[in-house]
Amino acid sequence: MEQTYEYAWIIPFIPLPVPMLIGAGLILFPTATKSFRRMWAFQSVLLLSIVMIFSIYLSIQQINSSSFYQYVWSWIINNDFSLDFGYLIDPLTSIMSILITTVGIMVLIYSDNYMAHDQGYLRFFAYMSFFSTSMLGLVTSSNLIQIYIFWELVGLCSYLLIGFWFTRPVAANACQKAFVTNRVGDFGLLLGILGFYWITGSFEFRDLFEIFNNLSSNNEVNFLFVTLCAVLLFAGAVAKSAQFPLHVWLPDAMEGPTPISALIHAATMVAAGIFLVARLLPLFRVIPYIMYLISVIGIITVLLGATLALAQKDIKRGLAYSTMSQLGYMMLALGMGSYRSALFHLITHAYSKALLFLGSGSIIHSMETIVGYSPAKSQNMGLMGGLRKHVPITQITFLLGTLSLCGIPPLACFWSKDEILNDSWLYSPIFAIIAWATAGLTAFYMFRIYLLTFEGHLNVHFQNYGGKQKTPFYSISLWGKKGVKKNSYLLTMNNNESTYFFSKTKYPIDKNGRKMTRPFMTIAHFEHKTVYSYPYESDNTMLFPIFVLGLFTLFVGSIGIPFNQEGVNLDILSKWLAPSINLLHQKSNNSMDWNEFLKDAVLSVSIAYFGIFLASFLYKPIYSSLKNFELINSFVKKGPKRILWDKIINGIYDWSYNRAYIDAFYTRFFVGGIRGLAEFIHFFDRRVIDGMTNGVGVISFIVGEGIKYIGGGRISSYLFLYLAYVSVFLLVYYLFFLTF
């Protein structure tokens, strides 16, 4: 086992050859590299699969042995300072490694088809592989310096992937917004790291915890300064995990391709903030007020994310706010000290949300055959509806992910979210009420998304629910100028062909994005060469990852279900996390009161079903039709109370749709204030600073010109003026200095 751990340092570097070789190939052999571009997708999946197998093996070793492993190389700069680089393999590392690799592999397979039409196909896979390297380096880091280096690389990859379609101004603005917002948190993280190094003299996690605990027990630290440093460290996690008030970048990050949303903004990168807080939890636990601050930020984010998701029309933005809310649950659990519950929900949410994002990508992919490449239309739930009969496999898996996120048993998120809800009662009744109420809101907005997307009729063909026909479907090309071609091909395979990884037939890249190229796994067995008036199911290459993630959503919750082992109720996750739990809680309790669990489960499921019922009542097609014909309104007495109720509903809708006006506030006061300050500084620099220097030059020039004209060019005049000046100076000197 020791030899296995010794080779763990290679984990982050296994996916690195892909971006390096793609970059070198595009520089040295651009034509050949583009011709064999499918090869890079296969290599990306293969290398990440190797990392996944290695990570699973390490996890099995840890479950059996309950141990840590750390290896450090020291770079001694002088006698007083040295930099240590190494890797740490513990339960938290192995959990994150498995999450990154399993979700990453599914996303890469999915992306081969989803991005097949895109001219930036190679660039996409280079970015994704480099992101995997950065994220794996982050979770295996043994000290704060390495964490910060890979933290910044992850931020760079996020910037590149959000702005992948940088020719679109909206995407360019979104990546800049994400970059700047994260820089605020990263600056705080850097200051916090330097502050704790100044206190303890070490960047290594285990040394840092031990030294700080000794200093704290002897009252040798300034707790006000320590609290400030801890808040600065936490600021980095707040920005990366889209917690209030640095959450504003996450919805705009949906401007990137949908596979990016599934990997980075659902399962891995936004979980980096949760990972950092979990890694530093032994430090935060001994600092006054910081744990309470973490829980307060978490509960605010839980409620804010859920309320902002209520009125979103863009399917990806709705899922983004859902992600923000669920990350708030994890942060709340960490603030309460529920280490196991937070990581359990991190695991279950990652698979469920990745399933939902890939499902939304399949929906968007099918809608583009009707509305063309226009994110404002293909992602608009108001133009969807009735997709259940057109994309049945996507509908089933999307429903599975929706039910999981709602907390319906026996799906994954039910087990993890219930633990957080139960722990919240023991921590604070106010926090518990908010958390339980938000569970109902989660069920409401998730089923709102599901019903608007899959139930009823395809709204792109109708102006309203009454059935009035609209104009023909849109025709918008990839670049927004030319219309789509009349033929939109699915994958084809003759009877005498077999399934293989690489296609023998070359398909050129169509510039307006509707003629798809074949993916490296071709399983389809039919051919259509017609214009689509309705959406169609995605190719099997996209459905396979969705199906696998659906299986994870069904069964991954079982790792947290206790089983009886030698008279003790123990689950796989608790055994896996035993070393970390013992580090935080010297006396951990593995027993479980099933009666208490069932009572709380009945309450949480009842709240979830109430949210589902409310969403069905408001967004089910039959209600929309009745409301359209004023049948429901005829039973409601119109009066002051009804008018007041309508105003309240409209106010809540506007507040939610406009993102609680937080973005507008930041735009006016921060962005506008900084721009105003920049304009004032520019004015002061040009008019005052430059005016002073230019004024001295102008005055000197005028005086010189005046003297030049007075002189006239005659030597006798120069001598006369010289003698006159000398006489005046002598007279002044005599009158003032010699007299007094």
From Swiss-Prot:
Keyword Transport: yes
GO CC annotation: chloroplast thylakoid membrane
Pfam families per UniProt: Proton_antipo_C, Proton_antipo_M, Proton_antipo_N
Membrane topology reported for the UniProt record: Multi-pass membrane protein
Keywords: Chloroplast, Membrane, NAD, NADP, Plastid, Plastoquinone, Quinone, Thylakoid, Translocase, Transmembrane, Transmembrane helix, Transport
Catalytic activity: a plastoquinone + NADH + (n+1) H(+)(in) = a plastoquinol + NAD(+) + n H(+)(out); a plastoquinone + NADPH + (n+1) H(+)(in) = a plastoquinol + NADP(+) + n H(+)(out)
Record GO biological process: ATP synthesis coupled electron transport; electron transport coupled proton transport
Broad class of the protein's primary localization: plastid
One GO MF term attached to the UniProt entry: NADH dehydrogenase (ubiquinone) activity
Keyword set includes Plastid: yes
Residue ranges of the TM segments: 9-29, 40-60, 89-109, 125-145, 147-167, 185-205, 219-239, 258-278, 286-306, 327-347, 354-374, 396-416, 425-445, 543-563, 602-622, 718-738
Listed InterPro entries: NADH_UbQ_OxRdtase_chlpt_su5_C (IPR002128), NADHpl_OxRdtase_5_subgr (IPR018393), ND/Mrp_TM (IPR001750), NU5C-like (IPR003945), Proton_antipo_N (IPR001516)
Location in the cell: Plastid, Chloroplast thylakoid membrane
Taxonomic superkingdom: Eukaryota
EC number: 7.1.1.-
Functional summary from the UniProt entry: NDH shuttles electrons from NAD(P)H:plastoquinone, via FMN and iron-sulfur (Fe-S) centers, to quinones in the photosynthetic chain and possibly in a chloroplast respiratory chain. The immediate electron acceptor for the enzyme in this species is believed to be plastoquinone. Couples the redox reaction to proton translocation, and thus conserves the redox energy in a proton gradient.
Protein family: Belongs to the complex I subunit 5 family.
Oligomeric form and interacting partners: NDH is composed of at least 16 different subunits, 5 of which are encoded in the nucleus.
The protein's name in its UniProt record: NAD(P)H-quinone oxidoreductase subunit 5, chloroplastic
Lineage: Eukaryota, Viridiplantae, Streptophyta, Embryophyta, Tracheophyta
Gene for this chain: ndhF
